[in-house]
Curated annotation (Swiss-Prot):
One of its GO terms (cellular component) is chloroplast thylakoid membrane. Keywords: 4Fe-4S, Chloroplast, Electron transport, Iron, Iron-sulfur, Membrane, Metal-binding, Oxidoreductase, Photosynthesis, Photosystem I, Plastid, Repeat, Thylakoid, Transport. The eukaryotic PSI reaction center is composed of at least 11 subunits. It is a peripheral membrane protein. It comes from Thalassiosira pseudonana. This is Photosystem I iron-sulfur center. One of its GO terms (biological process) is photosynthetic electron transport in photosystem I. The lineage of its organism: Eukaryota, Sar, Stramenopiles, Ochrophyta, Bacillariophyta. GO terms for molecular function: 4 iron, 4 sulfur cluster binding; electron transfer activity; metal ion binding; oxidoreductase activity. It is found in: Plastid, Chloroplast thylakoid membrane. Residues 2-31, 37-68 form the 4Fe-4S ferredoxin-type domain. InterPro entries: 4Fe4S_Fe-S-bd (IPR017896), 4Fe4S_Fe_S_CS (IPR017900), PSI_iron-sulfur_center (IPR050157), PSI_PsaC (IPR017491). The gene is psaC.
């Protein structure tokens, strides 16, 4: 099944999502847009199993990483974004 992983510019570069991913889909890459100088990236999205552990690990009020399963459309699920 094909999943889409979106990383938003609200990422604070904390690496929580990267450490939470059981299949190493995510990695940190250099980015000057935040204090930490890095942002999450999803270069191996084909390995995403849709567990959404990255979403759960994200400490920001506005989830910086979102996983959309297959044909799932953008929906709030009670979360601000």
């Amino acid at each position: 099944m094909s999943h889409t992983v979106k990383i938003y510019d609200t990422c604070i570069g904390c690496t929580q999502c990267v450490r939470a991913c059981p299949t190493d889909v995510l990695e940190m890459v250099p980015w000057d847009g935040c204090k930490s100088g890095q942002i999450a990236s999803s270069p191996r999205v084909e390995d995403c199993v849709g567990c959404k552990r990255c979403e759960t690990a994200c400490p920001t009020d506005f989830l910086s990483v979102r996983v959309y399963l297959g044909a799932e459309t953008t929906r709030s699920l009670g979360l601000a974004y």
